[in-house]
UniProtKB/Swiss-Prot annotation:
SUPFAM superfamilies named among the record's database cross-references: tRNA-guanine transglycosylase
Binding sites annotated in the UniProt record for Zn(2+): 309, 311, 314, 340
SUBUNIT field: Homodimer. Within each dimer, one monomer is responsible for RNA recognition and catalysis, while the other monomer binds to the replacement base PreQ1.
The organism's place on the tree of life at top rank: Bacteria
Lineage: Bacteria, Bacillati, Bacillota, Bacilli, Lactobacillales
HAMAP family from the UniProt entry: Q_tRNA_Tgt (MF_00168)
Renumbered residue ranges of the record's region RNA binding: 252-258, 276-280
Gene name, Swiss-Prot/TrEMBL: tgt
Protein name, entry field: Queuine tRNA-ribosyltransferase
Cofactor binding: number and manner: Binds 1 zinc ion per subunit.
């Protein structure tokens, strides 16, 4: 068995669910799980400084291989001493493989071959090519603590035969990526389980990847248009297929109920651009549901955004002021709203960890969803 650069330590299992409390040890520190990871696509979490992220207690952030490959270039980042030094972040970093972005840019399925994927840059339209070896090489240059294998991420609703071929290719690509990995002593590589909504294909993917002894395992191909019920069903049969002594990462999920439901099903790590993306539109997550701060009813509301929140935004500014800043397109408004949403999700995970410790996660979920409004007819995802 490989001596991996990152290690998972199980602290406690919740008595009534598949949830687990643990920690992940990396070359740049240890973070508790379950954990939500803010997304810093281009080596920055939009509008946030590294110091602010540390005060949130996020513990780990995510950056995007595809975007950093194109700009400023992975070789330049390596010249700077790696991503940690480049962006002045001394805590763990996870990089994705770029696969999800690449597949959104592929204009023809014929451009996905056994060798790799041909596509056009979103910046200047030039033709690019990415394959498992290149994706690993870029991430080796970036120097992230946790890396992702290059996978094919098909839409959820695809014919069985197409998904089967995709799963088999992803397994072959995973092995190629593992063989190309130059820095196993200080970078942990995760395999990504695919298979859309087909249980037998998820089982095949998990079996293929767990036989390769990755440092951890990601669950991909979800949060791509399927229903919440369908996502939970896939997690119900996928997470039990993964090793208990390694981290489990659900990619691209950030809605509060999805985070809790993922934890209930044994997931340790989550990421999503949701909190910062909706914040820039003035949509905020609170203990009492979503708030669209642009609404006229907040114009004369001089109360805190969320009376149950102790973040910098809620302890210093009113709803009326936030509404004014967002309506005026002021950068400070984007910063305050982004800070709050990230604080909300990071602290939701802190509360979830306590609920696991207390063996009352199902009660916590019920109380949270009732307050948030998820139990109302036509409730929104976030």
């Amino acid at each position: 068995m490989t001596e991996h650069a990152i290690k998972y330590r199980l602290i406690k299992k919740e008595k009534h669910t598949g949830a687990r409390l643990g920690e992940i040890i990396t070359p740049h520190g240890t973070f508790p799980t379950p954990m939500f990871m803010p997304v810093g696509t281009q080596a920055t979490v939009k509008t946030m400084s590294p110091e602010e992220l540390k005060t949130l207690g996020s513990g780990i952030i995510l950056s995007n291989t595809y975007h950093l490959w194109l700009r400023p270039g992975d070789e330049l980042v390596a010249e700077a001493g790696g991503l940690h030094k480049f962006m002045n972040w001394d805590q763990p970093i996870l990089t994705d493989s770029g696969g999800f972005q690449v597949y959104s840019l592929v204009q023809n399925k014929k451009n996905i071959t056994e060798e790799g994927v041909k596509f056009k840059s979103h910046l200047d339209g030039r033709e690019l090519f990415l394959n498992p070896e290149k994706a690993i090489s870029i991430q080796n240059n970036l120097g992230s603590d946790i890396m992702m294998s290059f996978d094919e991420c098909p839409p959820f609703y695809q014919p069985y035969d197409y998904v089967k071929a995709s799963v088999e290719r992803t397994s072959r690509w995973a092995e190629r990526g593992l063989n190309a990995h130059r820095r196993p002593n200080d970078q942990g590589l995760f395999g990504i389980v695919q298979g859309a909504g087909f249980e037998d294909l998820r089982r095949q993917s998990a079996s293929d990847l767990t036989s390769m002894d990755f440092a951890g395992y990601s669950i991909g191909g979800l949060a791509v248009g399927e229903s919440h019920k369908e996502m939970n069903a896939v997690l119900d049969f996928t997470t039990p297929m993964l090793p208990e002594d390694k981290p489990r990462y659900l990619m691209g999920v950030g809605a509060p109920d999805s985070l809790i439901d993922g934890v209930i099903r044994g997931v340790d790590m989550f990421d999503c651009v949701l909190p910062t993306r909706i914040a820039r539109n003035g949509t905020l997550m609170t203990h009492f549901g979503r708030v669209n701060i642009r609404n006229a009813k907040y114009e004369h509301d001089f109360t805190p955004l969320d009376p149950m929140c102790d973040c910098y935004t809620c302890t210093n500014y009113t709803r009326a002021y936030l509404r004014h800043l967002i309506k005026a397109d002021e950068t400070f408004g984007l910063r305050l709203c982004s800070y709050h949403n990230l604080h909300f999700l990071v602290n939701l995970m802190k509360d979830v960890r306590q609920a696991i410790m207390d063996d009352n996660l199902l009660e916590f979920r019920e109380d949270f969803c009732e307050r948030y409004g998820y139990n109302q007819p036509n409730a929104k995802d976030f």
